[in-house]
Amino acid sequence: SEAASLPVAALTALNAMRKCGVRKGTEVIAGGRTGTRDKTVAEVLVTGGTGGVGHFAIQIGRAYGARVTATCSPANAELALKLGASETIDHNAVDLFSSGRKFDAVFDAHGHMKIWKVHRLLKPGGAYASTLFIPPPYMAIAVTRILHGRKLMSANMRSLDEDWRELERLCSEGSLRPVIENTFPLERASDAFDLAMRGGFRGKIIVTV
């Protein structure tokens, strides 16, 4: 059942980290830059840090050497820290956009961020990835201007051999492990769906066949 929870969510998180320039063995290479390395550790923000995609993103970011800040509820803060976050922020109590915080990369795993405000959270050359729909290229140009030159990218999963091998490596070395909120038999699939629609759960929901 743990393996069943990996494909879409973990691949989405992996793709987001890579598109934002956070890769194995790198420091700050935000926005996909591959030039001279900055010796500073990459600062990454993950929203929805204990959700289905976000909890994978925290672990991948940590495995790649980034300093991950995660948004979550106070009830889930301990879990986020155990997953590898260096810091948690209560998304209901703190207005990130007016906080003055800056990150090399922002991954909106929750999918609720206002795109036109994201530039306030990004350092120059920073990158923003989201699980939401990202505009096509001709519209993305306009959005990039709104972001003041910061990069905007979709975190949609891709299914390539190299990505599957990387997930296998991360799991084998113990750097990536799914959190299972609940497991339902097929005859209770409607209960699983209701839980998913309510939100607020941690990690993944499994339906066994």
Regions found by a protein language model. Name each.
Residues 1-209:
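Terminal helix/beta-alpha structural elements that buttress the NAD(P)+-binding lobe
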